[in-house]
Amino acid sequence: MKRTYQPSKLVRKRRHGFRARMATVGGRKVIAARRARGRKRLSA
């Protein structure tokens, strides 16, 4: 059986990166919530 996590920096950036988040309303809310919480890293 193949493992579920097959790391790829490119896929990680495209799916969960800052620009991917900013592209949708929901994603912008995620960034805002993480800023409000004081997260050191906002996105992948």
UniProtKB/Swiss-Prot annotation:
GO terms for molecular function: structural constituent of ribosome. Belongs to the bacterial ribosomal protein bL34 family. One of its GO terms (biological process) is translation. InterPro entries: Ribosomal_bL34 (IPR000271), Ribosomal_bL34_CS (IPR020939). HAMAP family: Ribosomal_bL34 (MF_00391). Keywords: Ribonucleoprotein, Ribosomal protein. PROSITE patterns: RIBOSOMAL_L34. Signal peptide: none annotated. This is Large ribosomal subunit protein bL34. It comes from Methylobacterium sp. (strain 4-46). Transmembrane segments: none annotated. One of its GO terms (cellular component) is ribonucleoprotein complex.
